[in-house]
């Protein structure tokens, strides 16, 4: 999926939805900017295997998204402003293994998150599959430390103790001891 259009201010207003087979509820439902790791309409150059965000606002998604019979992709502009969207979708018609999983992505937002409350990234997932990661855009509204969020994974019936328990939000994103801006110390 390679969309492109003018207007960073619309990245949160353009909603990407992807439906597999005859689904009535989308497996992917996310603002376009957030799907491409550009939260709050802020440009972030990304060069990774599954996602690239290039100068000039070109978004490229290379996640494998197999389907068997039907795929429907929609883009909904929820703003009052008209825009033009350019896109390219590449696909191959081939046999899909029976155990092949469908791609899913969701958007979750709490604004503001009450101090000291648990923020759930992904909840109540059923079935087999692979969790491939999280993109998170956050802001701090106080002078307190934001990092010790302790990312926890409760898997396959865990209740009292998680299968995986991290040491802090910044560590989950490979930024041990913060992502402090060396110039502003923010």
Which residues does each predicted region cover?
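Beta-strand-centric surfaces of beta-sandwich/beta-rich domains
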Residues: 2-186
């Amino acid at each position: 999926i390679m969309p492109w259009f003018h207007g960073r201010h619309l990245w949160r207003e353009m909603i990407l939805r992807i439906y597999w087979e005859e689904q009535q509820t989308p497996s992917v439902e996310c603002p376009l900017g957030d799907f491409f790791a550009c939260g709050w309409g802020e440009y972030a150059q990304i060069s990774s295997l599954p996602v690239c965000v290039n100068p000039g606002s070109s978004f490229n998604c290379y996640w494998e998204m197999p389907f068997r019979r039907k795929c429907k992709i929609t883009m909904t502009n929820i703003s009052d402003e008209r825009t033009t969207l350019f896109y390219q979708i590449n696909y191959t018609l081939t046999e899909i293994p029976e155990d092949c999983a469908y791609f899913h992505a969701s958007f979750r937002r709490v604004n503001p998150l009450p101090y000291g409350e648990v923020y759930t990234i992904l909840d109540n997932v059923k079935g087999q599959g692979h969790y491939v990661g999280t993109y998170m855009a956050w802001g701090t509204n106080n002078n307190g430390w934001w990092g010790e969020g302790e990312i926890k994974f409760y898997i396959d019936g865990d209740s009292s103790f998680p299968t995986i328990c991290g040491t802090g939000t910044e560590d989950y994103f490979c930024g041990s001891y913060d992502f402090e801006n060396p110039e502003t110390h923010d």
